[in-house]
Amino acid sequence: MAIRTFRPYTPGTRTRVVTDFSEVTGRKPERSLVVSKHRRKGRNNRGVITCRHRGGGHKRQYRLVDFRRNKHGVTAKVAAIHYDPHRNARLALLFYADGEKRYILAPAGISIGQTVVSGTEVPIEIGNAMPLSAIPLGSSVHCVELYAGRGGQMVRTAGASAQVMAKEGDYVALKLPSTEVRLVRRECFATLGEVGNAEIRNTSLGKAGRRRWLGRRPQVRGSVMNPCDHPHGGGEGRAPIGRSGPVTPWGKPALGLKTRKRNKPSNKFVLRKRRKTSKRSRGGRDS
């Protein structure tokens, strides 16, 4: 996979940077693994907006992805690499020896014709799924289960990977992409390797229209709203917000407020909290 840039023959192509889709081999998705999905548009069952700036965009069909990898001991051959409109990662289409077809997240470095398998005693190769207890220390993994049998819930985005740090008793210590070190049960499954399409972080949409194609609507500043719409709104002209610091549309502090519960039961599994992001790395001024 490579990054493609464009000459500035229009304002929209001046800063446009996209992936060239060279790793995608399948033109159409597998029909048996595609279902229709109702587009929520950021609304709940009563039609109330619960997630702002969502709606519109190109039509999509949901690909059924196998996050459980529960066909233990049955080898599968990678038949194609497909595009998924619902995620940045690519999908690998697997043809199992018993005739079943499934999608999995395509790991970096996987190739057409490669054989993958899941189980408790499988080779240490990219794309194979196995319990964390069977994975060597220092290995990179993705699609990690939080609870055995529930399917991969962590480390699923493009270019992400977690590192196996230590094993002690019934738990395995994982260093997550956020730099947090967390304990996970040793019987939980994970897939070897990192998720492919890591170059997606270097892309740029280039224009507002491409963002609308993805189903993202414009974000309006609170200071230009009315007082009934945002705490920052109102006033004559470009008025200050009138508060000691910026707040959310619901009046809560917007910068630096911790949202995790202090007494959350899973806190005991977090050995080291994630590293805080500095102002310089966020793009702000360094005091």
UniProtKB/Swiss-Prot annotation:
Pfam annotation, one family: Ribosomal_L2
Extract the ranges annotated as region (Disordered): 221-287
Q: Which domain of life is it from?
A: Bacteria
Q: Give the Basic residues compositional bias ranges.
A: 258-287
Q: Does the keyword Cytoplasm apply?
A: no
List GO molecular-function terms, semicolon-separated: rRNA binding; structural constituent of ribosome; transferase activity
Q: InterPro entries attached here?
A: NA-bd_OB-fold, Rib_uL2_dom2, Ribosomal_uL2, Ribosomal_uL2_bac/org-type, Ribosomal_uL2_C, Ribosomal_uL2_CS, Ribosomal_uL2_dom3, Ribosomal_uL2_RNA-bd_dom
Q: Which UniProt keywords apply?
A: Ribonucleoprotein, Ribosomal protein, RNA-binding, rRNA-binding
Which Gene Ontology terms of cellular component type are present?
A: large ribosomal subunit
Oligomeric and partner information:
Part of the 50S ribosomal subunit. Forms a bridge to the 30S subunit in the 70S ribosome.
Primary role:
One of the primary rRNA binding proteins. Required for association of the 30S and 50S subunits to form the 70S ribosome, for tRNA binding and peptide bond formation. It has been suggested to have peptidyltransferase activity; this is somewhat controversial. Makes several contacts with the 16S rRNA in the 70S ribosome.
HAMAP family in alphabetical order = Ribosomal_uL2_B
Q: What is this protein called?
A: Large ribosomal subunit protein uL2
Organism, scientific name: Synechococcus sp. (strain CC9311)
Gene assigned in the entry: rplB
